[in-house]
Curated annotation (Swiss-Prot):
Specifically methylates the uridine in position 2552 of 23S rRNA at the 2'-O position of the ribose in the fully assembled 50S ribosomal subunit. It comes from the Bacteria. The gene is rlmE. It catalyses: uridine(2552) in 23S rRNA + S-adenosyl-L-methionine = 2'-O-methyluridine(2552) in 23S rRNA + S-adenosyl-L-homocysteine + H(+). It is found in: Cytoplasm. It comes from Bartonella tribocorum (strain CIP 105476 / IBS 506). This is Ribosomal RNA large subunit methyltransferase E. The keyword S-adenosyl-L-methionine applies.
Length: 242
């Protein structure tokens, strides 16, 4: 796959984006200052521009690309499950790397939000926290995964510690799923928010994987508290787990 982790340093290009920017400026008095700042940052984000060029559905695709370029845990022929997949950027990246087909998809995503169909990717529209979700994922994939990805994050409240705890909970649920379904030697990548509560999860991951890392890829905004937990080379189920 073409290297795309160093997008142009300029703002979002094209006449369409310029027109949108002008509309944003004209309506500046009718929207909150925080919303206006977000729109202006979004329009000038080089990753947003590059995602249009490369055909990815979100700038988040580059977070996965950058992490994988460094640690090379996604490889051709693997089976992948993506939790919290909307709008589909991570599934696109995974499919392009591991290879897949419409008849027998190697990448399965799940989200309670609707995701428009993606070529060679199976998508389940359901809440991962539903009791039936884990079984549905394995049935759809047809085998145990080599990689479990999770970009799940709880809706933010504006209270940093609350947001941290809610997202860490989702990370813990994703990790529990990964520990129960991964093939030996498999890998797990999940979003977390910095705040301290991730230390317990890190300790658990270190028991079950040979290598565990904190990762903050360049595509993750510097002011964001998000980071990613990457656990490599699953040791396999212990007798207690079994």
């Amino acid at each position: 796959m073409k290297k795309t982790t160093k997008p142009p340093t300029g703002g979002y290009g094209g006449s369409g984006s310029h027109e949108l920017y002008q509309r944003v400026k004209k309506k500046a008095g009718t929207i909150k200052a925080s919303s206006r700042r977000w729109l202006e940052r979004h329009l000038n984000d080089p990753y947003v521009h590059q995602s249009k060029v490369d055909g990815y559905r979100s700038r988040a695709a580059y977070k996965l690309i950058e992490i994988n370029e460094r640690y090379k845990f996604l490889k051709k022929g693997q089976k992948v499950i993506d939790l919290g997949a909307a709008p589909g950027g991570w599934c696109q990246v995974a499919e392009r790397i591991v290879g897949s087909s419409n008849e027998k998809p190697s990448v399965v995503g799940i989200d309670y939000l609707h995701v428009d169909p993606l070529p060679r990717v199976a998508m389940l529209e359901m809440d991962f926290l539903h009791a039936d979700a884990p079984q549905k994922l394995i049935e759809t994939l047809g085998t145990k995964p080599d990689v479990v990805l999770s970009d799940m994050a709880a809706p933010t409240t504006g209270h940093r510690q609350t947001d941290h705890l809610r997202t860490i909970y989702l990370c813990e649920v994703a990790a529990d799923f990964a520990l129960s379904v991964l093939k030996p030697g498999g890998h797990f990548l999940a979003k977390a928010f910095q705040g301290g509560a991730e230390n317990t999860l890190l300790a658990i991951l270190k028991q079950h994987f040979k290598k565990v890392y904190h990762v903050k890829p360049p595509a993750s905004r510097s002011e964001s508290v998000e980071l990613y937990l990457l656990a490599l080379e699953f040791k396999g189920k212990t007798k207690i787990q079994e």
